[in-house]
Design a protein with these regions (language model features):
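HTH-adjacent hinge/linker in prokaryotic transcriptional regulators
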Residues: 63-83
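Poly-acidic low-complexity segments
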Residues: 6, 49, 78-80
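N-terminal helix-turn-helix
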Residues: 36-67
């Protein structure tokens, strides 16, 4: 999964993460049931805070695009074409 952050962009960093993951789900780059990086792992990979990544994952979960599985991590949900 590739996420590119523009630190001084128009959107907040967590929104950039949400939008990029959302686009990868819609385009099929990320498939249903595919595991996402851990919150800490993604934060370290893209150089943002854990809190920022957590907020992005929470937003994606609210939108029904990802789900959290206890003690296992986050997984992509089946995209039904509606957001």
């Amino acid at each position: 999964m590739v996420i590119v952050i523009e630190p001084h962009g128009t959107y907040a960093i967590y929104e950039q993460i949400v939008n990029q993951i959302k686009n990868q789900i819609i385009s099929g780059t990320l498939q249903p049931d595919e595991a996402l990086p851990s919150i800490r792992g993604l934060a370290a990979e893209i150089g943002v805070s854990v809190i920022t990544t957590k907020r992005a994952y929470e937003e994606l979960e609210k939108e029904g695009l990802i789900r959290s599985v206890s003690n296992r991590g986050f997984y992509v949900c089946k995209y039904n074409g509606i957001i």
